[in-house]
Amino acid sequence: MNNTNTNTNNKNLASSSASVIFSKYINNNNNKLIPFKIKNSDLGRTRYFPPISKEWKNSIYVFNHNNLKNLPLFDININSLIKDYFNLQFKDKILFKKKRLSKVKVVSLNKIYASKAEIKHTNTKAILTVYTFNREKISLYKKIKKLKKSFYFVFDKIISFSERVILSGVPIRVDKDGKVLSNLYLPFRLRGVLPWITESHVNIWRKIIIASLYKELILLRKYKLRLDLNKYKFEEKLLYRLNNLIMKYYNKKVEFNIVNMRSFLLNSDILTKILALKLKNRNARVIKIMDVILNKANLPKINRVQEKASLIKSVDWNLLENKFKNLNLSFILNDASYAERNNLSELLNKLYYNVLLVSQKGVWALRSPKGEQPSFHSKSGGSPTKFIQKGAGAASLGGNAKAQPKVSSFAKAKKYAKIYQIIFNSINYKNMGGLRLEIKGRLTKRYRADRSLFKVKWKGGLKNLDSSYKGLSSVNMRGYAKPNVEYSIFTSKRRIGAFAVKGWVSGK
């Protein structure tokens, strides 16, 4: 009995001493007991991961590493093939009476510029993405417009001359070359001369028109031939030949994605090529050319103070992860209303693709809840239903806006608008943020290396707004390259020596 009492007393002393030590520890550390509560998640949006093609020009995975050794050489050969393909022209005998100098062909800026190919490999095919700027097409259309004005000018002269001849009553004599031998002049124009026109007059006028517009017609034929060749370069009629040549390198099928750009400023490869070609001219002024290119860059007009302001950290309740504690579908259905439970597609559509139709300054646009970017808009005004109905007609009837769309096509247009906007808003760095140009090398008329130039000019900025100002994390490519900046370098030479052009294009 004595032993059992002593054991119980020892246990009581140990427990009391432990409780005293625990209470002293709590009082000394000033810790408070926190009851168990369910804490809501405060996750932020996931970081934007740029496409892998912007990091590596070749995206490939192979089991045998020896297959990768030839890829750098293949890239050089394929890029030169693509460049030569887009520089294809007719023989000089077809378009010109005498042979053109090769220097004129190289220095000419009116051609199709192509960037370096971005190649994605699969087991069965290689997908080549090439960005192009079709300067030749723009210049040819401008020349045709000038010809159109000259046509009208010559026709006015012929009509006024024919009116004078008909009024005089003297027969018109035309030689073999179509030149009119009778030279009459009257100081006024006669209107309503159609009753006097005969078949002989029509034949004579045809000869006069052909003789007077001979040069213009020959030029028009040349421009038409060049336009047709320019068009066929982007079609399967000629692309299959380039396809067959590239297939010999990779021993698999080749697929092309050709992106025709509206401005050469949107791609750094094309930008540096054009700048280097302009600097090949000995009389070119370096600073002036750089200013001309930078002035063509249209940066969005945004309040710089608001754009660079740091974000206030707060919980984004629009995210699905923060709306629900559990992302299981059964848990979401229990919290939903009875009507939404029966229609699962409407519930998911409401949760993920909540697109609002907003009217802003007479322009109906489909926008996200934050109003980040419009998917498409109509400046003609009208109600939003008419706007979507027009899109439904275009989507269902191949762009025939006159046909009346059915109810199903109206619903398809709404879904199409949502999908379009979701994809469009998920892409970052769509707007141009800035440009930077560097030129270095022998760009003076002196045969001295110490007279080489180094010029730098920029417009806008190259910094990533998320990581530099807003305090958000961003993904770096290859450890040092910024995801919002595209960089390229192009080397060229003059009679005196070589020079290089560097270009940076940033997005935001």
From Swiss-Prot:
Keywords: Mitochondrion, Ribonucleoprotein, Ribosomal protein. Its main location: mitochondrion. It comes from the Eukaryota. One of its GO terms (cellular component) is mitochondrion. It is found in: Mitochondrion. Coiled coil: none annotated. The keyword Ribosomal protein applies. Component of the mitochondrial ribosome (mitoribosome), a dedicated translation machinery responsible for the synthesis of mitochondrial genome-encoded proteins, including at least some of the essential transmembrane subunits of the mitochondrial respiratory chain. The mitoribosomes are attached to the mitochondrial inner membrane and translation products are cotranslationally integrated into the membrane. uS3m is essential for mitochondrial protein synthesis and required for the maturation of small ribosomal subunits. Component of the mitochondrial small ribosomal subunit (mt-SSU). Mature N.crassa 74S mitochondrial ribosomes consist of a small (37S) and a large (54S) subunit. The 37S small subunit contains a 16S ribosomal RNA (16S mt-rRNA) and 32 different proteins. The 54S large subunit contains a 23S rRNA (23S mt-rRNA) and 42 different proteins. uS3m, uS4m and uS5m form the narrow entry site of the mRNA channel. Belongs to the universal ribosomal protein uS3 family. This is Small ribosomal subunit protein uS3m. It comes from Neurospora crassa (strain ATCC 24698 / 74-OR23-1A / CBS 708.71 / DSM 1257 / FGSC 987).
